[in-house]
Amino acid sequence: LHVGLNGTWPESGRRLQWTAKQQWKWNSKQRTAQQHSGVRGLIWLDIDQPGYHEISFSMREDGTEFDRWLMTTDPNFAEPDGIGPDESPMADVPDDAVDHSTPKVEPRGEDGTGDVSLSTDPTQWETVTLTLDGPWAREAGDDFNPFTDARLDVTFTHESGDFTYVVPGYFAADGNAAETSATAGTSWRAHLLPDVPGSWSYEVSFWKDNAPLKPFDGVSGSFDVADGKPDAHGRLEYVGERYLRFAGSGAYFLKAGADAPETLLAFEDFDGTVANKPGVPLKTWAPHVDDWNDGDPTWQGGKGKGLIGAVNYLAGTGCNAFSFLTYNAGGDGDNVWPFVRRDATFAYDCSKLDQWGIVFQHAASLGMHLHFKLQETENDDQRPGNQPTALDGGALGPERKLYLREMVARFGHLPALNWNLGEESTQTPAEQRAMALYLAEIDPYQHPRVIHSYPNQQEKVYTPLLGEMSELTGASLQNNWRASHQATLRWVKASAAAGKPWVCANDEQGPANFGVPADAEFGGKSIDYTPHDIRRWTLWGNLMAGGAGVEYYFGYQLPENDLNAENWRSRASSWTFAANALRFFQENDVPFWALDPADELVEAPATAWCLAGADAIVVYMHDATQGPAVLDLTDFTGTYTVRWFDTVEGGELITGSVETVNAGGKVELGTPPTQREGNAGHDWAILLTR
């Protein structure tokens, strides 16, 4: 603690030192270079004139609490007991006895004209950006906070009347902040993702201090949207089933990708991004700089290549998803937040968020699904103890509402994403429901809303949130790598029975210290399972239980771990196996959305799982060398063609020892067309079609 006198900070008042923790304690010691715990008798103020004097205090350490101050002229004064003597009366200071100064307020810029500009040549399923030349503001405004004192909404309506979106807007500084790092300006934005071509109209609602602000409020106009690409998938939507579906193509979606690093956005090329923990430095993503391609986006003279390249690499493997925390202040990484400062929860960093948006938009252009993890267990509430970074202490208050609105306004236009209420959420069910409901109210595109839990708290967390009135659309599952099938099956069935089927993905694999292991060439600890086991038990375990796919977590004790990873090649084999699984379902037109888990239909010497429908059946065998599987087709009719899929090598379907089977009883499926060499295992997927 530093003690000042009349606006000065004398050396004798500096570095008042305590060493006690979690208790109130009187002390009068000054920290020195030789004695960090402090030396008595070195702290004093020399007041050489009578009259009014101002004593000031400056806190040195975050987390230190300071409650009472005692002054004496006795150098031998003993430390008091308890709370000390009664407080002295405050001096009755005449108003003119001390100098007053007006706080510094930087000059305002001129307000904008109210003109609107739009993206050029907008097309169906491509983002249309509306920019309003609005009131001048700065991120950390003194007299006008653009995040709390104003609200922009833009209503977009298609000429047919069938599509209307009320889209939250946001303050965008000078409109080019990713390049300029601007903190002030007159640009305000909203984004539309148009479902259909044709004429669209817009009307601006702009309120300041709870009243419409002219000439900005009420600005309106129209624009034409051209036909999009005929094969465009469009927006990924929850449609009341256990799989998401694209609104444009009608295709159902399975995902596979990266859950790690959770600190993906702790990237040194983003403005205002700092590392708070020595063991969790900012990322360069240097191993992926060479994966950046000519024509890919950058900012500020070539920044961003590492992370853009990483996204290119992951998409190039055939995977289609990755996740990231957008707020981890006070958490494991403590290096990602959208604010201008870690604790400035009502002032958002325009340039940083624009730069995030460049990465997200590029990922979307590659068909990637973006998993927004909005918080983590360390900062979602106050239950573990005092956590100042928990927005509103875990409740749905002004901090949390603004945060969610800013995320929706800036990134909700992206076609494929989900909002995850939090990693390992420990908020109360009421708090979780309130957060999900608020997202549903402000997100015009109704992106899927999911929640993540500790493995041993799933019953406690998920059960109260089930039901047809739930605002959630899915579960982000964390389980031991070997328990993926059972856990997915549990919540697929429980959610359907409760009246609203959930989309259930396996997004984190235990044990927490290992997760999905790196490939052998990356070294690290020797553990008793391999990427082949992850393929057999985690990947196919989820898919064969009616799950929506996987994201892979990297643990915290293995190379390229959950906090410091910046080389996705460390899990190259796992990406290959996952992409093979996606291709099996997609390229062979497997109607997985019409198949139900039916493990009871298959008998095999080793573990086997089944998804069954009238026209297609998938059987997954963990070890096809143990003998043929027997499939009970008593309740089925017709003749089925039997083909095998190599889960390791991928490729086309091939015929084994049995080409067809007739339904009406139990049938043997035969043996696979080849036997694998080495330690890759002998798992195969079998597709039966009629």
Predicted regions and their residues:
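Short, solvent-exposed loop/turn segments at secondary-structure junctions
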Residues: 10, 61-63, 76, 251, ...
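Short, flexible, glycine/charge-rich loop motifs used to bind or transfer phosphoryl groups or to couple energy/partner
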Residues: 59, 312, 407-410, 462-467, ...
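Short, solvent-exposed coil/turn segments at beta-strand boundaries
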Residues: 241, 249-250, 469, 545-547, ...
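Short alpha-helical segments and helix-capping/turn motifs at coil-helix boundaries
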Residues: 52-54, 306-309, 488-491, 628-629
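Extracellular glycoside hydrolase catalytic/binding regions
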Residues: 402, 416, 422-573
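Aromatic- and carboxylate-lined catalytic core of secreted/periplasmic carbohydrate-active enzymes
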Residues: 103-106, 139, 500-504, 511-515, ...
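Extracytoplasmic
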Residues: 1-287, 294, 301-304, 308, ...
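Active-site mouth of glycoside hydrolases
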Residues: 151, 207-211, 228-474, 478-486
